[in-house]
């Protein structure tokens, strides 16, 4: 089953990333190590901590009327 969420701000994006990571059973530390970034950076992303890049991105999206969606797969337990 696919879950699709409309992403309106950094917080929503962070929540989607966190949900997907948790469903995959991957810790913040594991994800950070795999990507070569700090665990703190993963935590900040999941918390929707604003940064210049994110603020600009969402300002441009809003001003131009562009919508952003995030989609991830969830195993449907009913199928088992």
Language-model region placement:
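Short basic helix-loop element that most often maps to the first helix and adjoining turn
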Residues: 15-30, 34, 59
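Short, charged recognition helix plus adjacent turn
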Residues: 3, 69-80
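A short, Lys/Arg-rich alpha-helix, primarily the initiator
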Residues: 1-22
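DNA major-groove recognition helix of helix-turn-helix/homeodomain DNA-binding modules
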Residues: 53-71
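Recognition helix of helix-turn-helix/homeodomain-like DNA-binding domains
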Residues: 36-50
């Amino acid at each position: 089953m696919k879950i699709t969420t409309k992403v309106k701000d950094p917080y929503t994006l962070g929540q989607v990333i966190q949900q997907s990571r948790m469903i995959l059973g991957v810790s913040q530390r594991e994800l950070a190590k795999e990507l070569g970034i700090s665990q703190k950076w993963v935590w900040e992303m999941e918390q929707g901590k604003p940064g210049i890049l994110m603020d600009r991105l969402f300002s441009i999206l809003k001003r131009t009327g562009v919508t952003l969606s995030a989609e991830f797969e969830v195993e449907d337990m009913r199928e088992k």
